[in-house]
């Protein structure tokens, strides 16, 4: 691909240029990132070590937590460091890596949420065939397809970014590199690229969201014929999933279906989508799922007993 770039680095303006508020941003992002790592790593370790968390639902929860951790790590550490600097610059290649990694793990999370919805439907509505339909082999294949699909999606995004000529200026009014703010730095017409962006990212977000909400409406409607115990079990796992879907897809759809129009809240929405949801997801899942909470208690009980013996 022929590149026509005079820009070797970009200047990120971040959330604020005020030194006082930059310190506040540093503290908030650092706490959110540490909380994200702690919460998701607890889920990852619990699923891997607990025999009670070996069914397909927790297999997908494991990869959802891994995806949350990687998505946050691809963006948040850089924003934490930038909050301490007077002038924040990012090289062109690092910017492209950030675009690629954020879209890989963001898209992977979308696919995992879809797989989790399918898993919940089969578990509640077809319990006798659950282990046959959602077998370990099927879970592995579905996850491999999700990874491949995420990488293909991200390669398309990188192709779109690299097809644009950047001649300057190189100041990006954003917290991190993404296609929407990058489009504004291109020194050529970006209408076609913008349409491709919307048809790629926007369509994936919007269609997946509609499918998930529609599937849960059907799923919850089918529960009326089940016993109170089955309904309680379904709601205990599905409510948390629905909350995560709404929190994740709302900002995602907003960012990638607004045709490069900048609103004052754009940066805040992007931060919530990449940082906030990764922090909230483990909190929501552990608060609403008794099996995960029980496994975590046992894990920490064993740790405390081991420490006491020493």
UniProtKB/Swiss-Prot annotation:
Keywords: Cell membrane, Disulfide bond, G-protein coupled receptor, Glycoprotein, Membrane, Olfaction, Receptor, Sensory transduction, Transducer, Transmembrane, Transmembrane helix
Cytoplasmic compartment spans: 48-55, 119-137, 218-233, 288-310
Recorded GO CC terms: plasma membrane
CDD domains: 7tmA_OR4A-like
Glycosylation sites: 6
InterPro entries reported in the protein's UniProt record: GPCR_Rhodpsn (IPR000276), GPCR_Rhodpsn_7TM (IPR017452), Olfact_rcpt (IPR000725), Olfactory_Receptors (IPR050427)
Protein's name in the database: Olfactory receptor 4C16
UniProt organism field: Homo sapiens
Gene giving rise to this polypeptide: OR4C16
